[in-house]
Amino acid sequence: MPIATPKQKTTQRIKMRIHKGDTVQVITGKDKGKTGEVLRTLPIENRVIVQGVNIRTRHVKPTQEGESGRIVTEEASVHASNVMLYSNKKKIASRVELVVEKDGSKKRRLKKTGELID
């Protein structure tokens, strides 16, 4: 009898409205209300890594003889639906809409304040 192989999950890239360098505010979870800069986006997983948010402690074993192990704190990823773009001028978080300019270029705009991001 043949052995069943697990099905491969299709990796579908999700178009994200949050980009590296944006300032975002966490809207749910233990870090609710915290703001930080997006360090990295993970579009396949629909997640972002935000500076100073969702800190995890990791114990690292020594790699060479004579080296001691250490404890490292680093930011873990947060789902993109749990953050909103944050306006530093108005100090408010808002959803994002895509606006097509007359020349055909796309810009991101905050819905609450009307502030253009790109």
From Swiss-Prot:
SUPFAM superfamilies: Translation proteins SH3-like domain. It comes from the Bacteria. One of its GO terms (cellular component) is ribonucleoprotein complex. Gene3D superfamilies: 2.30.30.30. GO terms for molecular function: rRNA binding; structural constituent of ribosome. The keyword Heme does not apply. PROSITE patterns: RIBOSOMAL_L24. InterPro entries: KOW (IPR005824), Rib_uL2_dom2 (IPR014722), Ribosomal_uL24 (IPR003256), Ribosomal_uL24_CS (IPR005825), Ribosomal_uL24_KOW (IPR041988), Translation_prot_SH3-like_sf (IPR008991). Keywords: Ribonucleoprotein, Ribosomal protein, RNA-binding, rRNA-binding. Pfam families: KOW, ribosomal_L24. GO terms for biological process: translation. Part of the 50S ribosomal subunit. PANTHER family: MITOCHONDRIAL RIBOSOMAL PROTEIN L24. NCBIfam families: rplX_bact (TIGR01079). This is Large ribosomal subunit protein uL24. It comes from Prochlorococcus marinus (strain MIT 9313). The gene is rplX.
